[in-house]
A protein has these predicted regions:
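Conserved C-terminal helix/tail region of periplasmic/extracytoplasmic solute-binding proteins
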Residues: 308-349
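Bacterial N-terminal signal peptides
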Residues: 15-26
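Secondary-structure end/capping motifs
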Residues: 237-320
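Bacterial N-terminal signal peptides that target proteins for export
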Residues: 2-17
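Short, surface-exposed acidic
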Residues: 165-169, 208-212, 274-287, 324-331
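Periplasmic-binding protein-like
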Residues: 115-125, 209-235, 247, 286-292, ...
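Short, glycine-/small- and polar/acidic-enriched structural segments
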Residues: 32-184, 188-195, 211, 215-217, ...
Length: 349
């Protein structure tokens, strides 16, 4: 019989421990990541870098989230896509959400983090166009993508500026034809977001500063919020901590991206190598300045909303679009999932 030594006992103990460890790993696997599907407002561009930074730096993973981020086809479309269950989360126009919630309150998703706090909606016209104010739209032809946020809000602009909408011809075309349709004179004005049009024009060899002008909705009483993180009622009800974790991860990425915009654009380029990094960096900076830099963020922080301001926006849209009911502020946005106020960015530059 072989003598049992101290070293053999130690080896046996280690082997037993390793075996038990394997059993425990099998019995208690690592916590599964929650898989989420997100749809953007548009194609992969500089301003979408926030989301990809959160993914690349592991912020979503640290919150137990495995994210899939798909390109979008208009700022209004994420709302029905999230409402239908096709996606868990969307980056879309909060005004389209107000419209949806007015008509289908039981299905409507809810906003949890507003990123575009200034209205980007515009009608672009040629620099030499006789159109100077919204009233000049009468008798003209305006065009845009069917799901364009500015087009969806045009009835509200008509109401506020006393335009007779019946005197304005509206035509639809694919988003990639917008600048071409305008510059060739096939339409008198094109709906869109200011920076979307500006930078699409630049990529097409058009100088928007010399060849275009913009009739901006915000200059005519439409002090509206715009794109926000929209989540499904199902996700809010069944996995509120996942929603909170998503917002926390995104907020960290926003802070990082504000410090290093080139990193944000590089994260986009990783997914879409054909982008022009220099143009997308310029687009990123312009989006910060024109669409995300409302003075209120110094007080309430980026991501948050002013309830009184949102209530006024809801009233404007309900009245102008003759919606069937007036949603309450808490139906459209919840503060529940925001990080502590001290953690929200108070300045962008």
């Amino acid at each position: 019989m072989r003598a049992i030594t101290g070293s053999s006992l130690r080896r046996s103990a280690l082997a037993l421990g390793a075996a038990l460890g394997l059993v425990l790993v099998a019995a208690f696997p690592a916590a599964a990541q929650t898989k989420l599907k997100m749809v953007l407002n548009w194609k992969y561009q500089g301003p979408q870098g926030f989301f990809f930074v959160a993914d690349d730096k592991g912020y979503f993973k640290a919150e137990g989230i495995e994210i899939t981020i798909d390109q979008g086809d208009g700022s209004a479309t994420p709302i029905p896509k999230v409402a239908s269950g096709a996606y868990d989360i969307g980056f879309g126009d909060i005004n389209a959400l107000i419209d949806f919630a007015s008509k289908r309150p039981d299905e409507a998703p809810i906003a949890v983090y507003v990123m575009f706090n200034r209205p980007p909606f515009t009608v672009a016209v040629k620099a030499d166009s006789p159109i100077k104010t919204p009233k000049d739209f009468e008798g003209k032809t305006l065009g845009g993508a069917a799901n364009d946020g500015a087009l969806k809000l045009f009835p509200a602009l008509c109401k506020l500026t006393k335009i007779d909408c019946s005197k304005v011809a509206i035509t639809n075309f694919a988003p990639n034809l917008r600048e071409q349709m305008l510059m060739q004179g096939q339409v008198d004005g094109a709906f869109g977001y200011v920076n979307t049009i500006r930078f699409s024009a630049k990529l097409s060899g058009i100088d928007p500063d010399k060849q275009m002008r913009f009739i901006n909705y915000g200059d005519y009483g439409m002090d509206l919020y715009s794109n926000a993180i929209i989540v499904s009622k199902k996700l809010v009800k069944e996995k509120p901590e996942v929603v909170r974790g998503f917002v926390r991860a995104l907020n960290k990425a926003v802070i990082d991206s504000l410090k290093d915009p080139k990193m944000a654009v590089a994260a986009v380029a990783k997914r879409e190598p054909l982008i022009n990094p220099a143009v997308e960096l310029e687009r990123f900076d312009a989006t910060l300045k024109d669409e995300m830099n409302h003075p209120e963020i110094a007080r309430i922080g980026l991501g948050n909303i002013d309830d009184t301001r949102l209530k006024k926006a809801i009233d404007i849209l309900v009245d102008a679009s003759q919606l069937p009911r007036t949603p309450k502020v808490e139906e459209i946005f919840t503060h529940e999932f925001l990080p502590p106020p001290a953690d929200l960015p108070k300045a962008l530059f």
